[in-house]
């Protein structure tokens, strides 16, 4: 291949993976690399790179770094994954009488958008901050069941909860309702998560409608059980399991 050179890049869709790939490539390129986001996405890469010796700047939605910097070894502790915590949080929110506490969860603000959505849906949530790990905040979550209500998730909500949308769909099958728009990126994950999610929840007896950039779950029908194909996608597998509980 040819030598890499720095670029100024604005991703056409909000994608932390694309942003991270460009930044990491920029370390091996000549000159400066700048990634400018129209919508903020998870920022683990920007927080982690300085721990490994990389100098970068962040301002007004732009992340800049100079190529040729060498990474240095570091000992780090990885916080508990917020997306994995979301499954237990949804289970607690869905089942009457539930009261679940999760410790040492990563509370990076770009990863916990699902918590405010759960609260809007009716869950009762308490957050206790702990000692940060490096530049990553951590803490404990307490989630209790509450009366579930209809939830509207729009384009502004999606980047902070993109991976948790399938399990939030599962929550809506337990009551309330859910409408998601502006989430076309779901079609380009490990599977077409919109089509596969809708098909799977329908297979379990759910009242679900597919849209070009989202879906709608009408919580007016109790699931009857059935077969749901997760299409080899772990997030869909977790969503279908959560829909089936209770």
Model-derived features: positions:
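Structural preference for solvent-exposed beta-strand-turn elements
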Residues: 1-246
């Amino acid at each position: 291949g040819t030598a890499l050179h720095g670029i100024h890049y604005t991703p056409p869709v909000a994608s932390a993976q694309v942003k991270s790939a460009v930044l990491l490539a920029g370390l091996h390129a000549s000159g400066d690399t700048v990634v400018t986001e129209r919508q903020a996405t998870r920022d683990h890469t920007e927080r982690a790179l300085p721990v490994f010796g990389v100098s970068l700047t962040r301002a007004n939605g732009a992340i800049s770094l100079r190529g040729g910097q060498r990474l240095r070894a570091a000992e780090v502790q990885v916080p508990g994954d917020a997306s994995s915590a979301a499954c237990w949080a949804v289970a607690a929110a869905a089942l009457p009488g539930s009261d679940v506490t999760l410790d040492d969860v990563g509370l990076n603000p770009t990863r916990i958008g699902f918590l405010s959505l759960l609260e809007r849906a009716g869950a009762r949530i308490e957050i206790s901050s702990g000692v940060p790990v490096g530049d990553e905040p951590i803490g404990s979550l307490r989630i209790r069941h509450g009366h579930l209500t209809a939830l509207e998730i729009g384009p502004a909500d999606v980047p902070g909860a993109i991976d948790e949308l399938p399990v939030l769909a599962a929550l809506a099958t337990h009551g309330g309702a859910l409408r998601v728009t502006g989430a076309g990126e779901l079609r380009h994950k490990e599977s077409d998560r919109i089509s596969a999610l809708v098909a799977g929840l329908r297979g379990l007896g759910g009242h679900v409608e597919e849209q070009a950039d989202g879906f709608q779950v009408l919580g007016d029908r109790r699931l009857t059980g059935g077969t749901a194909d997760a299409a080899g996608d772990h997030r869909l597998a977790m969503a279908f399991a959560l829909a089936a509980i209770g």
